[in-house]
């Protein structure tokens, strides 16, 4: 499922996935042959709480149109409290994005377990659709790295 508009633009989406749950869910989606957009670039992280909000800002600076963080369900974290820390960090991130004028819809946090391959694929498809409707992220265009 590749979304391209009339000018040939395809959204660039970065997905930060927890090693213990969401990355395994992505693997299950792939091995089950469930489709999600090829323009979703997955980056494996040890735990969702290890995602520094600056990594999300850097992704936007480098040309991402949307960033999604996927982690274990609350109360089911491999590191016990990791996703509770994630909630606090992401609330800080959302206030930074508001300050910068970047639409909040361009960033999402989802809880996907290792057994939820179908949910992972559906989440990525839904997020890609949302980003496609929002269009290209031009807010940080002057800061983007040239290709």
Regions found by a protein language model. Name each.
Residues 1-147:
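Iron-sulfur-associated redox domains of electron-transfer enzymes in respiratory
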């Amino acid at each position: 499922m590749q979304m391209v508009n009339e000018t040939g633009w395809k959204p660039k989406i970065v997905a930060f996935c927890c090693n213990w749950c969401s990355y395994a869910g992505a693997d299950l989606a792939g091995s089950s042959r469930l489709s999600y957009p090829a323009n979703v670039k997955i980056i494996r992280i040890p735990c969702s709480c290890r995602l520094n909000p600056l990594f999300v800002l850097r992704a936007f600076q480098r040309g991402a149109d949307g960033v999604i963080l996927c982690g274990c369900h609350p109360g089911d974290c491999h590191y016990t409290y990791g996703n509770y820390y994630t909630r606090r960090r992401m609330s800080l991130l959302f206030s930074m994005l508001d300050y910068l004028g970047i639409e909040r819809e361009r960033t999402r946090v989802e809880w996907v377990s290792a057994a939820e391959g179908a949910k992972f694929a559906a989440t990525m498809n839904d997020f890609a659709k949302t980003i496609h409707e929002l269009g290209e992220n031009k807010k940080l265009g002057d800061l983007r790295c040239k290709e």
